[in-house]
Structures are given as structure tokens and as C-alpha cells.
């Protein structure tokens, strides 16, 4: 009998493997991405203190009118722009990008490109 592979378990293993190497500091915090079927979430985290400095998602009130559906590339672009503007307002210009075990493609790539265009450096 062939068992179906659980893609989320594989993603979590990849994420843990990468997290052993990537840490965020106060000078260069970690930008973590989580992707669900209907939404996308981003947090900028200082791992030394364990605090979330900035967060944004497709569920934010600022994006309610702009985004009709939260699970597509256009919504990811808007979230990338929003998180970059929030981070720059708090004085964060450089981050370490943590793709969360996801392949750098599609929504993850669009979010990263939009954040770079809006002024974040990674």
C-alpha cells in the first residue's frame, strides 16, 4: 500500500532545517512568511528577544478594500508593500528572508519582490 505524502510535514521539516541556520537580530530581523489556502501572513521577528516587530496579512483592515481574494499573487504583492511600509516606518530597512519552507515561486516570490521594491533590503 502506498501512503500519500503529507506536503505540510515535508514543508515543516524544510522550515526547521532552514531555521537552524537563519536567525533574526535587532539590527537585521527575520521576515517570516506563512501561506494558507486563502490568505498570506508575514511577520518581522527579532529572534534574540522573541518579539514580533511588524506584521501584515491579507486580513488587515488596510487591505480590505484593495484585495478581493486573499489567496492570489495580487494579494501577496499588496501584503509585501504593506509590510515594507510598516517596517520602514519603524526604522527597519534590512531583514533576513525566511520563506517558511515554501518554494520561492508564485505568491512567495511576488511578496518578496514587492517588499524589495517598496524599500526592504534582503
From Swiss-Prot:
InterPro entries: Ribosomal_uL18_bac-type, Ribosomal_uL18_bac/euk. GO terms for molecular function: 5S rRNA binding; structural constituent of ribosome. GO terms for cellular component: cytosolic large ribosomal subunit. It comes from the Bacteria. SUPFAM superfamilies: Translational machinery components. One of its GO terms (biological process) is translation. Gene3D superfamilies: 3.30.420.100. Pfam families: Ribosomal_L18p. Keywords: Ribonucleoprotein, Ribosomal protein, RNA-binding, rRNA-binding. The keyword ATP-binding does not apply. Belongs to the universal ribosomal protein uL18 family. Part of the 50S ribosomal subunit; part of the 5S rRNA/L5/L18/L25 subcomplex. Contacts the 5S and 23S rRNAs. PANTHER family: 39S RIBOSOMAL PROTEIN L18, MITOCHONDRIAL, LARGE RIBOSOMAL SUBUNIT PROTEIN UL18M. This is one of the proteins that bind and probably mediate the attachment of the 5S RNA into the large ribosomal subunit, where it forms part of the central protuberance. This is Large ribosomal subunit protein uL18. It comes from Ruminiclostridium cellulolyticum (strain ATCC 35319 / DSM 5812 / JCM 6584 / H10). The lineage of its organism: Bacteria, Bacillati, Bacillota, Clostridia, Eubacteriales. The gene is rplR.
Amino acid at each position: 500500500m502506498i501512503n500519500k505524502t503529507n506536503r505540510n510535514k515535508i514543508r515543516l521539516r524544510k522550515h526547521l532545517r532552514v531555521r537552524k541556520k537563519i536567525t533574526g537580530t535587532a539590527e537585521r530581523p527575520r521576515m517570516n512568511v506563512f501561506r494558507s489556502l486563502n490568505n498570506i501572513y508575514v511577520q518581522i521577528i527579532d529572534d534574540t528577544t522573541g518579539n514580533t516587530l511588524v506584521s501584515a496579512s491579507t486580513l488587515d483592515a488596510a487591505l480590505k478594500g484593495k484585495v478581493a481574494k486573499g489567496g492570489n499573487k495580487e494579494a501577496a504583492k499588496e501584503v509585501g508593500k504593506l509590510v515594507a511600509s510598516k517596517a520602514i516606518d519603524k526604522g527597519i530597512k534590512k531583514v533576513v528572508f525566511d520563506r517558511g519552507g515554501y518554494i520561492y515561486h508564485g505568491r512567495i516570490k511576488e511578496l518578496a519582490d514587492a517588499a524589495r521594491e517598496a524599500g526592504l533590503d534582503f
